[in-house]
């Protein structure tokens, strides 16, 4: 097998391929140009977008040329894959703003040389399509019967599929044809939910141009606990630090189930397989900390990752820098008078209601400093502060806040 494909396979990336042997032979013959698409349907990428981007970087490191297609045209329709309802329709101004934000995030992650990765926006060729010509030249090659066998459409037929969304596969296939013509693209990569669209695109190129092109998909990641990768109780795990703080981002990875640590180190870091195996021999917690640090470093930068690491160590290990923790300011007057612990946990955002706080205390999951809170009616005052005038409050093993008084500020 071609070394680049072998690397992806060894790390757990490959789910399906149109013809793995043929693709391997083509890659052995020399560098090829491939593409991955992302629709700008939001202001930030989330972790669910990133597995194909890790694969892109592996392929580029092996000497191949990557194209990131920003779906400024297709996003006006919305991909029905994996969706139970029609997406909100967005205008061009919003899509342009989202596209700019996404490109900035990818620039940071890829840190690339533009000779190896380039961007295109399918709005450039989709926005001015003549509908009649498109139906004759592209639509004639699609079978509705075959399209309805794809999982994305089968699921939506039960809840309602608009004709607008039904066109999405034709447009994505036309993207593959256009990129093949303009940039000699020979491979499309993406998540396994894109398999039907990718196969349809490869088939269109073969029918219209008589060329053989390829498709490669990656697994849709779920955690060992059944949770969809990148999903939290608060929603998606976004890369934008204004939506998900780097500390919370770090903690998400630090709390990876034991069974997933090796798999995620191989998929979401660029550590060698040998280094991954070596770190696992040092203990699962050491491996989890390295996973959290590496992913945070790749997404937010080394300095930010260091701060998140020190904050986590301060919260849970008794060392590190407490200043790196999420911080909430209380007035000195509040602590002089005292505040009920249930009110405190709600005020700092560790609980949504007093009932939640009482339940947390009853279950033994509330901590002020190093002390577990046992009394639902406890009052927290200045005596709870450490010598530096701060105190760490914690809900369970994952959520923590550093409290400071206004005097310190």
UniProtKB/Swiss-Prot annotation:
Record lineage: Bacteria, Pseudomonadati, Spirochaetota, Spirochaetia, Spirochaetales
Compartmental location: Cytoplasm
Record motif 'KMSKS' region, residues: 228-232
Signal peptide interval: none
Family membership: Belongs to the class-I aminoacyl-tRNA synthetase family. TyrS type 1 subfamily.
Binding-site residues for L-tyrosine, renumbered to this chain: 35, 168, 172
Name of the featured protein: Tyrosine--tRNA ligase
Encoding gene (name): tyrS
Domain of life: Bacteria
A Pfam family annotated for this UniProt entry: tRNA-synt_1b
SUPFAM superfamilies linked: Alpha-L RNA-binding motif, Nucleotidylyl transferase
């Amino acid at each position: 097998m071609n070394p680049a494909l072998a690397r992806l396979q060894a790390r757990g990336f490959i789910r399906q391929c149109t013809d793995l042997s043929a693709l391997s032979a083509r890659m052995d013959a020399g560098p090829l140009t491939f593409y991955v698409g992302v629709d700008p349907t939001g202001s930030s990428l989330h972790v669910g977008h990133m597995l194909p981007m890790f694969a892109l970087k592996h392929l580029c490191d092996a000497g191949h040329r990557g194209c990131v297609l920003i779906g400024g045209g297709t996003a006006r329709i919305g991909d029905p894959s994996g969706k139970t309802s029609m997406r909100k329709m967005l205008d061009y101004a919003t899509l342009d703003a989202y596209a700019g934000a996404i490109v900035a995030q990818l620039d940071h992650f890829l840190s690339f040389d533009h000779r190896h990765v380039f961007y295109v926006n399918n709005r450039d060729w989709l926005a001015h399509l003549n509908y009649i010509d498109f139906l004759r030249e592209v639509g004639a090659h699609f079978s509705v019967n075959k399209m309805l066998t794809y999982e994305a459409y089968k699921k939506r037929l039960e809840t309602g599929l608009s004709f607008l969304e039904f066109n999405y596969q034709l447009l994505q296939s036309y993207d593959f044809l256009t990129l093949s013509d303009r940039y000699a693209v020979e491979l499309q990569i993406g998540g396994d939910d894109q398999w039907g669209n990718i196969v349809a695109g490869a088939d269109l190129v073969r029918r219209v141009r008589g060329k053989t092109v390829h498709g490669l998909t990656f697994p849709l990641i779920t955690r060992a606990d059944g949770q969809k990768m990148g999903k939290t109780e608060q929603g998606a795990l976004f890369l934008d630090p204004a939506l998900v703080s780097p500390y919370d981002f770090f903690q998400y990875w630090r709390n990876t189930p034991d069974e997933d640590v090796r798999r995620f180190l191989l998929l979401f870091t660029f550590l060698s397989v040998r280094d991954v195996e070596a770190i696992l021999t040092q203990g699962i917690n050491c491996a989890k900390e390295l996973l959290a640090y590496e992913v945070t470093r790749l997404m937010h930068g080394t300095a930010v990752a260091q701060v998140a690491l020190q904050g986590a160590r301060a919260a849970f290990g008794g060392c590190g820098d407490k200043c790196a923790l999420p911080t909430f300011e209380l007035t000195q007057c509040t602590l002089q008078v005292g505040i009920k612990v249930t009110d405190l946990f709600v005020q700092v955002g560790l609980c949504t209601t007093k009932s939640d706080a009482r339940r947390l205390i009853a279950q033994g999951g509330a901590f002020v400093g190093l002390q577990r809170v046992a009394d639902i009616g406890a009052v927290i005052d200045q005596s709870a502060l450490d010598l530096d005038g701060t105190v760490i409050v914690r809900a369970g093993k994952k959520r923590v806040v550093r409290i400071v008084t206004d005097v310190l500020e």
